[in-house]
Amino acid sequence: MTATPFEELGKALGFGSHLNPDMTREDVLLHLGKMPAIPANLGVAREEEFEYDGVRITTLSWKVGWGKPTQAFLLTPIDANGPLPGVLYLHSHDDLKEFGKEKVAQHQERQLPESAMWVRREHYGDRAPANELAKRGFAVLVHDCFPWGSRGFSLDELPPRIKEIHGTADSAEFENLSVMFESLSLNKYLSLYGATMAGILNFDDRVALEVAKSLPEISGPISVIGLSGGGCRALFLHATNPEIRAVVSTGAMATYASMLHEHITPHSWMFFPFDLASKGEWPQIGMISDTPLFVQYCGDDQLFTKEGMADAHAMLEKHDGGRGHYRGEFYPVRHSFTVEMQEAAFDWLAKHV
């Protein structure tokens, strides 16, 4: 089979031929690019409180120093008495930016429009996993990260050129337009600023960790969990924040080499911080810290190859060397976080309290 120009370019540039066997936290932070300083005063505000199906949900907001304020849900069991083990729940990408936290957390009936309910049905076993985790005795913080939900942008804020290329500026096409904006324009801004998509998301998530640590409902180190884009963000927190208790990453692990070439387009820029691949393979992001890491692989994942996932698992298992810091499991499902996977992840988190 004839090599494509992209494959030939990769070979000409030596892609994958100079991997550093010891990727460090400093390497990752360098390739995440510039990040704003976390404000000393985040202005955390408690707003409304709801009770839904055995869970108390408090709406919170805070300011990260730029852009729109972050809105979040704090979920605890209704009968909770005193501080609980904390979990930061990172919502998925889904090419759906109008909503973030609402994909995984429920505070009232009819919270998501029917047009967005496919995310719950196809990706989360038709339930709100953050609520299920809270019912198990955890305090769960779920926040919108840039550029989703409250941290997102309106149709009017999209560059005119995006609307021209797409051929419409209709609000019904907002999600398609936002995907084009992320792929075509946002990274240009970030490149000019010396930043990356992964770095800006990591910033928002580290701010959320600081908020979580300040909440009276949460005690001790905080765990992190996420599917897909949320799983990618969880891996970056695993690599950059040694204070975390444990991390579950679902549907976000394979080798960089296997993502080329038919699998690179479906992925967000968050997987590809500038030149990180020159320092190591993607699985090495999970080797920097000894923080317990549970990686769940979707065996029939349409976003990764079976070989790429198997190779990543082998690399992580070899690095762990039987120390018990890494656990990897394969499930015969497409890209999703099924009820079975959720129960396994929640059981594992409970063992690391």
Identify the residue ranges that each predicted region occupies:
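N-terminal targeting or regulatory segments adjacent to alpha/beta-hydrolase or S9 domains
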Residues: 1-58, 64, 100, 136
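Cap/lid segment of the alpha/beta-hydrolase catalytic domain
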Residues: 92-203, 213, 260-261
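Primarily recognizes the serine-hydrolase "nucleophile elbow" in alpha/beta-hydrolase
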Residues: 200-277
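C-terminal catalytic histidine-bearing segment of alpha/beta-hydrolase fold enzymes
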Residues: 320-353
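The feature captures the conserved acid-bearing segment of alpha/beta-hydrolase catalytic domains
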Residues: 256-317
